[in-house]
């Protein structure tokens, strides 16, 4: 099994900043946990891939959450990532699938919808948050992340995302790239890169052919123009815990907790991101009430 990872690079003497990722295993983990059907797998996988690369732009303990809500049948897509390559995600309606579109591809646009917003919240530490959003312009997601960067962060970018799904619903290939134009970039560089992106083979096909993140960027930017900086391993990782959900239950207040004791003699919580279930005994709930009244 090939390791998922992101590569960071500069190109054309610093005119271009670039990221590329192979995320096949992480998207497979999400597919397995949520039992997503193919169109939902593609939508979730594309969102997770973009989010992972955006996470790789962060530093230290910073993290970010991306929410895509196009008011389509799939509902909301939520993914979050950190600077260390940990990624997780879920969709409201994982069992969403449609016939292939006119191009013979998974109809992600129909599932996502085109009437809504893409929102990014960055947790940059010390309880400091940056939030930006942009309208969904395509529903195919690559174009929507491209538009987000142009309008919300004022960084001209090209975002390519792809997921191929096998007939048995497993993930055949997943990955993508983010190419960003730095301030004062030369016009001829921008023209070259735009042309290369316009002519390239779909990213999911390149990953399926076995191309690494480095080879993806070489394909777009040309071997002689790219300087690779570092790689970040990517994995599906959820940081939920018994303790975190216990604190969340505590936040519901005494009346709500008492109702759980009276009606169910305990409680169960399920994590949206990884589907882990946590059981809480009547004694634990009574302990929370005691803490609230201490």
Swiss-Prot record:
CDD domains: Hsp33
Full protein name: 33 kDa chaperonin
Species in which this protein is naturally found: Staphylococcus carnosus (strain TM300)
Keywords linked to the UniProt accession: Chaperone, Cytoplasm, Disulfide bond, Redox-active center, Zinc
Free-text function comment from the UniProt entry: Redox regulated molecular chaperone. Protects both thermally unfolding and oxidatively damaged proteins from irreversible aggregation. Plays an important role in the bacterial defense system toward oxidative stress.
SUPFAM superfamilies: Hsp33 domain, HSP33 redox switch-like
The keyword Kinase is assigned to this record: no
Disulfide bonds: 238-240, 271-274
Classification via NCBIfam families: PRK00114.1 (NF001033)
Gene Ontology biological-process entries: protein refolding
Compartment(s) where it occurs, according to its Swiss-Prot or TrEMBL record: Cytoplasm
């Amino acid at each position: 099994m090939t390791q998922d990872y992101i590569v960071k690079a500069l190109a054309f003497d610093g005119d271009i900043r670039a990221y590329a990722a192979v995320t096949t295993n992480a998207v497979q983990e999400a597919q397995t946990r949520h039992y997503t059907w193919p169109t939902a797998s593609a939508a979730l996988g594309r969102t997770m891939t973009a989010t992972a690369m955006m996470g790789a732009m962060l530093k230290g303990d910073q993290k970010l959450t991306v929410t895509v809500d196009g008011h389509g049948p799939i509902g909301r897509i939520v993914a979050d990532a950190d600077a260390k390559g940990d990624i997780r995600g879920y969709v409201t309606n994982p069992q969403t699938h449609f016939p292939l579109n006119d191009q013979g591809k998974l109809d992600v646009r129909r599932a996502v919808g085109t009437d809504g917003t893409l929102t990014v919240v960055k947790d940059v530490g010390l309880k400091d948050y940056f939030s930006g959003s942009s309208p969904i312009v395509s529903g195919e997601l690559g174009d929507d992340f491209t538009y987000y960067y142009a309008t919300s962060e004022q960084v001209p970018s090209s975002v390519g995302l792809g997921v191929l799904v096998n007939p048995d619903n497993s993930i055949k290939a997943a990955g993508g790239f983010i190419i960003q134009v730095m301030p004062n970039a030369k016009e001829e560089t921008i023209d070259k890169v735009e042309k290369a992106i316009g002519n390239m083979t779909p990213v999911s096909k390149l990953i399926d052919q076995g191309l690494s993140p480095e080879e993806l960027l070489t394909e777009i930017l040309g071997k002689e123009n790219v300087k690779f900086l570092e790689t970040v391993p990517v994995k599906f990782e959820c940081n939920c815990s018994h303790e975190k959900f216990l604190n969340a239950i505590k936040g519901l207040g005494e009346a709500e907790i008492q109702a759980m004791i009276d009606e169910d003699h305990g409680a169960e919580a399920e994590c949206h991101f990884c589907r882990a279930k946590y059981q809480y005994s009547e004694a634990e709930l009574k302990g929370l009430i005691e803490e609230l009244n201490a």
